[in-house]
């Protein structure tokens, strides 16, 4: 077919299928039309269909959302369709419903090569199938309710009985795959209950978990593939549970199938390698822990991690519900499935549901039941009911285990994590491991019967934490099973705790429904209720809104729907509340969310679409979107994972949850749900709200749920999901507050937990709501709810203000404080959820306690706390700010005038408390200044505390997270800066005037016009500052600063003072001001778009040029568009020509001496003034952009590096760069190592000081020698009579001394450079351009000399990258590569990088675009940059003039966003310049020139050799990418200038390798895109062997070019086209003694055969030999020597003489104070000190034979 069977919306192309790029209309999913009715929609493939379906059939199931952008791959439902599998084993008609269970049974039984009870179960399953089938019928009816679309989907998915036919094929892989495919398709759209699960539950007891086809349980602890060991003992529990489940969920099969399929499709899930009881362990988790954290490996597992809950999934869930299938009514079953899936519950749940899920759920339900047992649908039913009902026992058990707070909810471990679906022994084992879970299902014989703890609660959703910092940091794996358990829990409405489905021991099927009828309803709606996890940060793509109607609508017994769909696991698709269907909130948001700027969906570090399909998918291409839930701080992956993990890895504590939640996503929506759950902790309560809650839970993204769930798990089991939703639905929540039904819909969009309205909202409504909710992510996270600024935010918050107040006040207060869930909603969802239900409200913020007050605040303090201008809903979502923002924003809620988001964020922030507040601040929003000011946005107290602490909040995700994307960042510099989430911090390269304070005020007033703009504006600078801080603490101020930063760069200091609001603010108060600026910056930034002119405050430093560091977070995340000005914003600005605001505030001293406590130690924080720092910290410093680098440790992505640096910078340590080293106090080269700058070569006194001068150096040697002599004097003087012995001693003494001298030389030349500096945004203000003329223009950047106030003795270079900000990802890649390397003399160091608005006059290469080529023009541009930049306070000092010039320019036009880097090495020219300028010299004195070339090549080889251990290949070695730094004997870096292109051989020039933008690094951090295609790549490509000797080859070309010869391959392109030999290479004229050696070296390096090409280390040896090694005479003698001994003696004697001569040279130089050691001396010492006879002979041979 032209169109694939299943329509998966393309992340980047909304209307098109990601698989076939055809419009949705063409995707009819023709196969199995009969099934379609059963299947709600293809879980994955039919995502769009399902979306439509859902939309149409709002009643039956949530309208399909465009497509939930979920981190998890859409499970390729094992199309084993429980049907096929079940059908085979049992009636295939029932396959739809029981397929999952049966599928398992079939996989185990039908496919059972292992007899396990699968066959019996199969029979039973078959017998049971009819029930499920009945359920299926009901499901079909439900589908009918849904619309013809459902039917179509079913057909496409083959949900009909048709798949049952395949049941007979059980044994054949094809059949198996066919069944799975059917199941898979059905599961995509299915609504049928997983009959397989129902059928196979009976024999669960006695079954053991089967790993890799083996029956033995790996361990309870959980290994990579570990399943709960309760296989026997627990199995019985599971049996009971399964029985209960069976009774209740006859629909489990579908769910199971889906889950199974999903799981299978997430093949490679095994990546949850280290599953632990509380981590990824399939083992039963502690009851109190809601989420299991699964460390995500870098592997595909990650995709599994977040199940891509498509609308189709929701539909499936809905379908199940319709079918009365207890599809995941029992949370346990679902949790089982989830476990299977290992990845987020949803995915597994869906997939598993269809197939794996069925067996898995069976297992889970069966507990002890082996997957084989799942075959019996009866058993399943029985167990299920038991699970549900008895589940109360089991659940209680599990519950107690699973959730401490919630009623005992059987915590079914999501053993699924490690499950492998395999058709081994006829068993279908979910193979989580395999990426192609589907294929693996049938392929691997491993029947991983994961005996999930029979707990209905099921395993907590796994929060997959990527231990390895996978590229897709945002991936959060949530265990669907937890969600299922949640559903199960929901079932037991009796239990107050939603989470613990088991909470309702009464209800036979906890998850399904309390009564059998309920169970039927459950079957019908249970699945429908399943919430779809949205793996998007701010919004849960599928807001599950339980529909009361769903409860009754079920064809099966119209049992009162489980109103409490306690989605234990936010991700679990469990239709916990049969009544609440997961209503995919169909909103542009969902579809967009997957891949929108806020999500970063599809942004580089995250693999967005996973194409792998299980074989059974059978080309029903269900593209798996793996848009990672992109939290605003998703890029801060570390923060996200931390948030998921929580401090303990489980967000058990509310605070933890909140913090985590905030960090993670806006998925805090879950919180909202949790609050609902919490509020109506009782199941009944939940039931009342159950639909909404349940739906809400569903709605919550998996990730959110995970966060919330983890957090909530400890708090209250029922709440977690809600909590999760809460984040998402924060905006929705607000709306909910306003109108519960509407709110619910909105909530649905924002967070499924908003399901409070018992009826489902229309998909369109939900979608619109979702859209609204999703858009908020645009606004700064901090004030997510504050204002309608974010597109969605406005919508969401439009109602929310009231709703928020209502919800905050009514529900927030009581529940939130206590329950984890309460806190969780802290995200965007918080407000809306709060609205939804008091609990939800309360839960809005994990620390909702503040939220509770928040309602009052909302009403009372809306003014005082103007919400951030545009706190993006996402910002709310970002867990960090969620707490504080919620607090603040709740306060602001009353004042809906401003961005509502602010309130929401405030609530979130508040809930989190100071830490959360800080975290809540979206780091991304931060402009450099904003960054700092933003901090102030946190609670002022928190701010103050943090400020005092001097910490931004650590990478742990406490305070620093800037996750929330900036709303609409219209700032110039942010516009580009935020180009990609992967981008690193951005700085605005601006010239700002000191009047910044005034500007800030103005900006603030503007920004606050909506909010408290007037307050801030009206206030005196101090008052303003304070207010700003307070507001900031509320997160609105921080937002304002962002905006200001971004848009208000206020006019250039001179002309555009108004444009430098940020500058002004920062400057005004210095510290407080900055904070104000930050606070203002966001709002202002927003307003600034319209009011940029308004920012009238004059730039404090009219002609100051400053770099503003938007902060990695900004750059990294899309939110960076509206960078906040952290308190250090001004500080951030690098003053190119003027003072930075910070400086002005600090002491108005040229150098802002008083850094915040951070000091250099922060590596770049030092520049920040303490107050600013405090404010930054207190505001939680949006500064650190988790996106970039939650932790310096994240090497996973370049983003990490930027993040870390910004994050760190903001953090107590300014982690300026990716690395943590920032903490070192050394960050700033201090006078201590005056040599700290590279120039230290022979740094004047420093050189001598550091080296103790040559003499001191010699002294040390002598001293060492003496030291040796004193203790060993006797030894030394022994054997004086023996000449040979004495010679040996002298030889060894010389060798040792030379080694020490070589090390000393390294210390001398690397003085101060061994410590990696990390300048954070706070340090920018301490930099000033010492000249407006570039000192060097390289291939990738232009360099300007700059001085650093804190290290006046050393010069620094400001590197302005030529690539546009949009292309800055390239630089970040380069940065990530470089930061993975240790410091090296010949590798350029990045001491700080930012995205900045750079005046065109500083961009010589911009000439073509801008008429201003001249310096003046550039200056004008610079002016513009200043004005336009988010007001960095340029340093007025030396830069004043240039600043002024810049100011003169038109800031808007002439500024461009570029990555600006601070480096220690000030290049004077490139090797290209050197070669060009040395043409004449080469002719005059070829010896000297070619020796110089050898020295440069030696340094190049030394640098390249340094890359090898790190598996880095530069791949772009060009003359223009090699920089030269001249060192004179004085030790000072020589001024640049081609005038002396070639330094004398005595003082060789230092060569630095730069521009790693094309570098290749072979590591586990492989681009997901590449990984995805590896299956089709040749080994040499996968292993990157083609790059292994690329640098060697390019070095060979450089030899020609440096000798003024053309590139042989440019001159003779045919050389490469044919198989050339070394003899074909052009000859190098022999002009000097070095020419012949260089010819040989070039031919060796250009060997066409890579395997024969010499290594760079050999090339280095050859160059050393050419420079200082044996000459021809020695070679001849060497050749004449017949024996090896003689040759070695010859070489040894030569070495001894050379070493002695070098020692003499060192001795002489020590007396020559003026001369000092030269670079050549050092290089020679390195050579002679470490040369050996072997190494020498090897090189001699190469030279002789080549």
From Swiss-Prot:
Pfam families xref list: Pkinase (PF00069)
UniProt region (Required for homodimerization), positions on chain: 1285-1311, 1670-1743
Effect of substituting residue 665 to F: No effect on focal adhesion subcellular localization. Does not affect colocalization with F-actin
Subcellular location: Cytoplasm, Cytoskeleton; Cell junction, Focal adhesion
Compositionally biased intervals (Acidic residues): 1406-1423
UniProt gene name: PEAK1
Family: Belongs to the protein kinase superfamily.
Top-level taxonomic group: Eukaryota
Feature: compositional bias, Low complexity: 338-349, 492-513, 718-730
Designated name of the protein: Inactive tyrosine-protein kinase PEAK1
UniProt biased composition (Polar residues): 355-364, 675-694, 748-758, 820-841, 889-902, 1440-1450
Stretch list, region Disordered: 44-66, 334-411, 489-517, 551-577, 671-700, 713-764, 802-920, 1052-1102, 1138-1158, 1402-1456
Domain-level remarks: The dimerization region encompasses helices both from the N- and C-terminal of the protein kinase domain.
Compositional bias of kind Basic and acidic residues: 903-920, 1052-1062, 1084-1094, 1424-1433
Organism of origin: Homo sapiens (Human)
Phosphotyrosine: residues carrying this PTM: 635, 641, 665, 1188
Outcome reported for the amino acid change (mutating residue 665 to E): No effect on localization with actin. Decreases localization in focal adhesion. Fails to regulate focal adhesion dynamics. Decreases cell migration
Subunit details: Homodimer. Interacts with BCAR1 and CRK. Interacts with PRAG1. Interacts (when phosphorylated at Tyr-1188) with SHC1 (via PID domain). Found in a complex with PPP1CA, PPP1CC, SHC1 and PEAK1. Interacts (when phosphorylated at Tyr-635) with tensin TNS3 (when phosphorylated on the SH2 domain); TNS3 also interacts with integrins ITGB1, ITGB3 and ITGB5 and mediates their association with PEAK1. Interacts with RASAL2 and GRB2.
Residue ranges of the TM segments: none
InterPro entries cross-referenced by the UniProt entry: Kinase-like_dom_sf, MitoQC_Scaffold_Kinases, Prot_kinase_dom, Tyr_kinase_AS
Outcome following mutation: residue 611 to Q: In a bladder carcinoma NOS sample; somatic mutation
Keywords: Cell junction, Cytoplasm, Cytoskeleton, Phosphoprotein
Cellular component terms per the entry's GO annotation: actin cytoskeleton; cytosol; focal adhesion
GO molecular function, one term: identical protein binding
């Amino acid at each position: 077919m032209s169109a694939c069977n299943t329509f998966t919306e393309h992340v980047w192309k909304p209307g098109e299928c990601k698989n076939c790029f055809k419009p949705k209309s063409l995707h009819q999913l023709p196969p199995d039309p009969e099934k379609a009715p059963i299947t709600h929609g293809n879980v994955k493939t039919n995502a769009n269909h399902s979306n439509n379906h859902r939309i149409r059939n709002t009643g039956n199931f949530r309208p399909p959302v465009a497509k939930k952008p979920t981190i998890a791959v859409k499970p390729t439902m094992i199309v084993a369709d429980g049907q096929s599998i079940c059908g085979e084993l049992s009636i295939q008609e029932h396959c739809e419903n029981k397929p999952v269970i049966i599928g398992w049974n079939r996989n185990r039984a039908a496919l059972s090569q292992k007899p396990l009870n699968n066959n019996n179960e199969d029979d039973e399953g078959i017998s049971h199938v009819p029930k499920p089938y009945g359920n299926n019928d009901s499901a079909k009816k439900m589908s009918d309710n849904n619309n013809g679309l459902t039917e179509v989907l079913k057909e496409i998915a083959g949900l009909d009985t048709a798949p049952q036919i395949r049941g007979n094929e059980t044994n054949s892989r094809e059949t198996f795959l066919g069944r799975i495919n059917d199941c898979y398709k059905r599961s995509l759209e299915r609504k049928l209950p997983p009959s397989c699960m129902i059928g196979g539950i009976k024999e669960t007891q006695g079954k053991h978990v089967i790993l890799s086809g083996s029956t033995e349980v790996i361990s309870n602890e959980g290994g990579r593939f570990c399943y709960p060991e309760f296989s026997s003992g627990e199995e019985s529990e599971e049996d009971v549970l399964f029985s209960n489940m069976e009774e209740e969920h006859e629909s489990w099969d579908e769910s199971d199938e889906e889950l199974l399929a999903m799981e299978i499709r997430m093949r490679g899930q095994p990546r949850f390698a280290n599953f632990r009881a509380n981590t990824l362990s399939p083992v039963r988790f502690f009851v109190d822990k809601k989420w299991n954290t699964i460390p995500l490996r870098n592997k595909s597992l990650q995709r599994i991690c977040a199940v891509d809950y498509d609308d189709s999934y929701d539909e499936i869930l809905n379908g199940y519900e319709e079918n009365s299938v207890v599809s995941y009514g029992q949370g346990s079953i679902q949790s089982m499935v989830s476990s299977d899936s290992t990845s987020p519950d949803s995915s597994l749940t869906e997939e598993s549901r269809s197939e794996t899920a069925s067996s898995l759920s069976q297992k889970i339900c069966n507990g002890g039941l082996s997957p084989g047992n799942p075959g019996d649908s009866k058993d399943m039913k029985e167990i299920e009911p038991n699970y549900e009902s008895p589940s109360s026992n089991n659940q209680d058990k599990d519950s107690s285990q699973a959730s401490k707070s919630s009623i005992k909810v059987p915590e079914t471990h999501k053993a699924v994590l490690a499950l492998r679906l395999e058709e081994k022994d006829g068993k279908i084992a979910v193979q989580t491991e395999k990426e192609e879970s589907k294929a693996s299902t049938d392929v691997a014989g491993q029947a991983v019967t994961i005996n999930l703890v029979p707990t209905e609660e099921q395993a907590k959703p796994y929060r997959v934490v990527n231990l390895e910092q996978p590229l897709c940091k945002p991936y959060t794996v949530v265990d669907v099973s937890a969600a299922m358990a949640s559903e199960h829990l929901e079932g037991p409405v009796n239990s107050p705790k939603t989470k613990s489905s088991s909470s309702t021991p009464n209800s036979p099927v906890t998850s399904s429904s309390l009564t059998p009828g309920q169970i039927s309803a459950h079957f019908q709606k249970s699945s429908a209720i399943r919430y779809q996890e949205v793996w998007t940060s701010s919004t849960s793509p599928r807001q599950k809104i339980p529909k009361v109607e769903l409860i009754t609508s079920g064809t099966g017994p119209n049992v009162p729907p489980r109103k409490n769909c306690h989605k234990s696991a936010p991700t679990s698709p469990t239709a916990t509340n049969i009544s609440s269907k997961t209503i995919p909130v169909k909103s542009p948001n969902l579809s967009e969310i997957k891949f929108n700027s806020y999500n970063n969906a599809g942004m580089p570090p995250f693999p967005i679409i996973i194409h792998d399909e299980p074989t059974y998918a059978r080309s029903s291409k269900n593209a798996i979107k793996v848009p990672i839930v992109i939290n605003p701080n998703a890029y801060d992956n570390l923060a996200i994972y931390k948030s998921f993990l929580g401090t303990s890895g489980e967000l058990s504590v509310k605070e933890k949850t909140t913090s985590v939640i905030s960090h993670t996503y806006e998925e805090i929506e879950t919180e909202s749900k949790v609050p609902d759950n919490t509020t109506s902790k009782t199941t009944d309560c939940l039931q009342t709200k159950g639909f909404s809650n349940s739906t809400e839970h569903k709605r919550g993204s998996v990730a959110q749920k995970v966060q919330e769930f983890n957090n909530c798990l400890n708090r209250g089991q029922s709440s977690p999901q809600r909590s999760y939703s809460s984040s998402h639905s924060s905006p929705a929540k607000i709306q909910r507050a306003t109108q519960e039904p509407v709110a619910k819909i909105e909530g649905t969009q924002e967070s499924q937990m908003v399901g409070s309205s018992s009826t489902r909202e229309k998909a369109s409504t939900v979608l619109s709501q979702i859209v609204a909710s999703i858009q908020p992510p645009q606004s700064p996270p901090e004030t997510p709810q504050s204002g309608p600024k974010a597109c969605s935010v406005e919508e969401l918050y439009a109602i929310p203000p009231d709703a928020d107040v209502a919800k905050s006040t009514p529900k927030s207060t009581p529940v939130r404080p206590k329950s984890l869930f309460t806190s969780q909603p802290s995200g965007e969802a918080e407000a809306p959820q709060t609205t939804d239900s008091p609990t939800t409200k309360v839960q809005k913020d994990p620390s909702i306690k503040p939220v509770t007050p928040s309602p009052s605040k909302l009403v009372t303090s809306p003014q005082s706390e103007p919400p951030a201008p545009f706190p993006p809903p996402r910002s709310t979502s970002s867990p960090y700010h969620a707490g504080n923002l919620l607090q603040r924003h709740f306060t602001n809620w009353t004042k809906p005038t401003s961005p509502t988001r602010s309130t929401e964020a405030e609530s979130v922030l508040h809930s989190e408390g100071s830490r959360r507040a800080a975290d809540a601040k979206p780091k991304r929003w931060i402009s450099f200044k904003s960054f700092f000011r933003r901090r102030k946005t946190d609670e002022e107290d928190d701010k103050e505390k943090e400020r005092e602490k001097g910490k931004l909040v650590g990478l742990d995700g406490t305070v620093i997270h800037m996750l929330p994307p900036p709303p609409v960042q219209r700032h110039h510099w942010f516009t580009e800066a935020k180009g990609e989430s992967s981008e690193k911090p951005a700085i605005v390269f601006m010239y700002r005037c000191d009047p910044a304070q005034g500007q800030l005020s103005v900006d603030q007033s503007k920004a606050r016009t909506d909010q408290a703009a007037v307050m801030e504006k009206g206030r005196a600078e101090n008052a303003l500052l304070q207010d700003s801080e307070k507001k900031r603490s509320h997160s609105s101020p921080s937002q304002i600063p962002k905006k200001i930063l971004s848009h208000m760069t206020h006019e250039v200091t001179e002309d555009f003072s108004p444009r430098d609001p940020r500058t002004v603010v920062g400057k005004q108060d210095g510290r407080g001001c900055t904070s104000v600026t930050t606070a203002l910056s966001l709002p202002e930034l927003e307003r600034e778009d319209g009011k940029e002119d308004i920012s009238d405050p004059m730039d404090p430093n009219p002609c100051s040029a400053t770099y503003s560091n938007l902060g990695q977070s900004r750059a990294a995340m899309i939110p960076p568009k509206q960078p906040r000005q952290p308190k250090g914003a001004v500080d951030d600005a690098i003053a190119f020509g003027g003072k930075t605001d910070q400086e002005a505030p600090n002491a108005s001293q040229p150098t802002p001496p008083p850094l915040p406590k951070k000091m250099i130690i922060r590596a770049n924080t030092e520049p920040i003034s303490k107050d600013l720092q405090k404010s930054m910290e207190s505001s939680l410093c949006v500064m650190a952009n988790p996106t970039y680098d939650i932790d310096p440790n994240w090497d996973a992505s370049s983003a990490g590096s930027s993040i870390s640096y910004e994050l760190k910078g903001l953090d107590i340590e300014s982690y300026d760069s990716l690395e943590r080293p920032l903490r070192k106090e050394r960050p700033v080269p201090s006078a201590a190592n005056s040599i700290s700058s590279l120039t230290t070569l022979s740094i004047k006194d420093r050189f001598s000081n550091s080296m103790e001068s040559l003499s001191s150096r010699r002294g040390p040697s002598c001293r060492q020698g003496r030291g040796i002599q004193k203790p060993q004097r006797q030894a030394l003087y022994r054997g004086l009579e023996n000449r040979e012995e004495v010679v040996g001693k002298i030889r060894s003494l010389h060798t040792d001394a030379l080694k020490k001298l070589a090390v000393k030389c390294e210390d001398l030349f690397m003085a101060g450079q061994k410590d990696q500096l990390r300048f954070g945004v706070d340090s920018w203000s301490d930099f000033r351009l010492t000249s407006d003329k570039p000192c060097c223009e390289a291939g990738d950047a232009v360099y300007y000399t700059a001085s650093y106030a804190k290290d006046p003795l050393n010069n620094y270079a400001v590197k302005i990258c030529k690539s546009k900000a949009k292309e800055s990802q390239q630089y970040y890649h380069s940065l990530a590569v470089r930061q993975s390397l240790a410091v090296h003399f010949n590798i350029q160091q990045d001491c700080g990088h930012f995205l900045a608005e750079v005046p065109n006059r500083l961009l010589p290469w911009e000439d073509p675009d801008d008429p201003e080529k001249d310096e003046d023009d550039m200056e004008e541009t610079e002016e513009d940059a200043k004005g336009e930049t988010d007001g960095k306070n340029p340093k007025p000092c030396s830069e004043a003039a240039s600043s002024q010039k810049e100011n003169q320019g038109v800031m808007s036009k002439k500024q461009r966003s570029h990555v600006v880097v601070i480096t220690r090495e000030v290049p004077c020219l490139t090797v290209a310049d050197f070669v060009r300028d040395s043409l004449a010299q080469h002719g005059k004195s070829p010896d000297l020139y070619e020796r110089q070339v050898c020295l440069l090549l030696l340094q190049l080889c030394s640098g390249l050799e340094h890359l090898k251990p790190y598996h880095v290949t530069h791949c772009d070695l060009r003359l223009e990418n090699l920089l030269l730094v001249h060192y004179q004997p004085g030790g000072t870096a020589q001024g640049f200038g081609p005038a002396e292109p070639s330094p004398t051989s005595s003082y060789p020039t230092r060569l630095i390798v730069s521009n790693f933008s094309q570098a290749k690094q072979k590591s586990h951090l492989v681009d997901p895109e590449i990984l995805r295609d590896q299956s089709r790549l040749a080994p040499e490509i996968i292993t990157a062997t083609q790059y292994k000797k690329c640098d060697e080859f390019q070095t060979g070309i450089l030899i020609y070019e440096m000798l003024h010869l053309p590139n042989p391959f440019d001159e003779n392109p045919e050389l490469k086209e044919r198989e050339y030999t070394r003899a074909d290479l052009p000859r190098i004229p022999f002009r000097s003694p070095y020419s012949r050696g260089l010819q040989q070296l070039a031919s060796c390096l250009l060997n066409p055969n890579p395997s024969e090409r010499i290594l760079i280390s050999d090339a280095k040896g050859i160059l050393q030999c050419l420079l200082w090694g044996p000459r021809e005479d020695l070679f001849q003698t060497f050749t004449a020597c017949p024996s090896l001994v003689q040759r070695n003696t010859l070489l040894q004697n030569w070495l001894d003489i050379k070493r002695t001569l070098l020692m003499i040279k060192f001795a002489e130089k020590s007396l020559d104070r003026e001369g000092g050691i030269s670079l050549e001396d050092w290089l020679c010492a390195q050579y002679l000190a470490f040369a050996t006879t072997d190494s020498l002979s090897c090189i001699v041979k190469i030279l002789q034979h080549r």
